Amino acid sequence: MSLNIKKLALKSFIKKIFKLCGWNLIKFRKPPDPNPYGKISFELLKKMNDCKGILHLGAHRGTEAEVYNWFGKKVIWVEASPFIFNELKENLFFYKNQIPLQALLSDVDNEELDFYISNNDGACSSTSNFTDEINKSVVYKGRNFKMLKKIKLRSCTLDTLFKKNNITSTNYDHWIIDLQGAELKTLKGS
């Protein structure tokens, strides 16, 4: 068992003990850079302001929650990784109009799929494994990404996720999709 997996198991165990005592650990992080992607356009701000709600697929830990709250938007967050999902729930605890859901989105319901947990804080976890070709590509070259663990998850279509959770899709007209290569399959399932 690798050191990272042992750390995850220990962290999970400690959190469970605290929860049994009625306590909750909240991780304080350095806030992200104001905008690592460059200048925000007025057009983007207007779209965020004018939308009814936000559907964020590939939530990770929900670092954008404060921004969405600032706009006063209701948000549905979807994250596949069960390890990251618990932290997502904790991070969204104070945002009552933001709902976290755990699902591996695809174009078929209830299909058992391999889901690879990556290093890089789990941010690149995916149904696709890193190959040497991917690691040498322009996007990933020199980053040393790798998958640490493979788990089995059942897939769910976006339509099924909406039905199971009584979500009206038209209430969420601003979509952010970052599913590490599963974007097209997810859209086919909607």
Regions found by a protein language model. Give the residues of each.
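Phosphate/nucleotide-binding beta-alpha loop and adjacent structural elements of enzyme active sites
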Residues: S2-S190
